[in-house]
């Protein structure tokens, strides 16, 4: 019997197989509006209220490294990445459940610090930490957060729904989280080298990361774009499709297009990249645009709106219009600063099983 | 600065510390009725509907051993233990979210098999597998399931609510899951010995476990007591307090008493123990009562009802009345078959951090 390694098929085809197996279970619950394949599941609670639900698992050495991550920040990030998924449905977060698998080396104080980070983020977003589960772990720390949010049926936004002619918008700036990660990894290597060579690692040899504060903060303490959800509601704009950028702009735009049955054309010179991100890319001899397209973990919102809504968002400093939705036949492309058009589907985002 | 190992304070005091940190976040969400400290969080959706939500994390080598656990059974069990938490609130399960951290050694076929077990259980309970998250893992498999259920405000049952004079009831039989686990562990040892000695391990040397089918099934494929929730509703009985037996009767009865501010007196000769469980205990020179009191993982329901409801449940073959709720001052005790009264608080259930 042939056995297939998961990395042979990758994360998204694995999710496809999982969806197929889960499919027959959906019939039991007629109020379910949307199952696997979006940022959240969506189900009807009443004629005026939908709930959305999401879960994210964070694994030591895969999603974080405690050598470079203050544990309180990690707690905050675990909340933020789930809030970001709720925001991607144009919904407001309400309740969080936290599951932990805790290695033997962890102390009570470390768990308290982790929860203080979660508490801080929960208070920021106005959500309740309402329950959870704790277990021991034979290996590293595992954090699984599940979150329930609410949205009016007229406001909910799925990945599908983009139409040719819609504008492609993105919040904030991209690539910063990837830049921050590269800096932290470099710093970790320097630290480990010093330890290996029995040399002191202290403030004298540590890089001054103060000037790269923003990028490191983007990596360690990302904030979900709850204010964008509120802004869009205040402006009376309902996006036709939305996703949060967790895998990278390229991959996440492809999710919108494949589920909407469309293509897209975006423009390099409109992609918001922070000056600091460009500086870090220069210093590390890397490409800031690649970080923006494939770095992931920016937790910005990528959404599409009908063209006639552009006036309603153009005064927002936080939203950039980076391109347009096209017919599927036109493909998914980016024009570079020289006017060349490049196929975006050749540029992949993060895949947990193919790294 | 003094650092405390988690095993010094144990699982329940750790949860206490977590609750304190989470407490301030509860104020943001006035619809939240019950936070950390019960089998589920409870929140109001409308005047006629509450939702309950729970999460359970299953970790390789802590909660399961793939040497003795068919992976499809594991999928089914991951669903059942969450349904059991929903049932403990007297609620009906609706939606499940599944998070997996998958080790590199896992194949696509193994994940499909895991999900087929989940699908099987989901169809059995009538719940939708509505979403999830997949990640790689540097070590063992981690499964985190979160589940949302529904209950009418007049039916919801918390751990608190037991009153002196109430009858203490339990469904099914206890200790079977512990008996099954001991058998599987013995079989694993025999297998590993054979492998170590380069001797074949095949059907000729494998123990015939057919006669212990029920106990092994209790361990590998427990079923949540959804039919008890339906039965109680049909009978018009609302338990005053309820919990599912995941840590063991002793520990879980103490949870009801501490949250209700009561004591309890139960009777050894009324505790339902399957004949097969007693046989296995004899064979392994262990004590079946200890398994029933502290073995855990039986996923039966432990609940209390007003004395005048006893007539409504006495025709159920699945429910045993094992004792009575008392004033707090009387403590929490068990009378043995010789009439001796023993303090139950000295008999501890499973603690993830003190094993």
Indicate residue ranges for each PLM-predicted region.
Chain A
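Short helix-loop capping/hinge motifs at secondary-structure junctions, enriched
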Residues: 49, 152-157, 310
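A generic local secondary-structure boundary/capping motif
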Residues: 30-32, 40-41, 119, 132-136, ...
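Small-aliphatic-rich amphipathic alpha-helix that forms the alpha element of a beta-alpha
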Residues: 71-95, 116-124, 231, 251-256
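Phosphate/diphosphate-binding glycine-rich loops and adjacent basic-rich segments that engage nucleotide
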Residues: 153-220
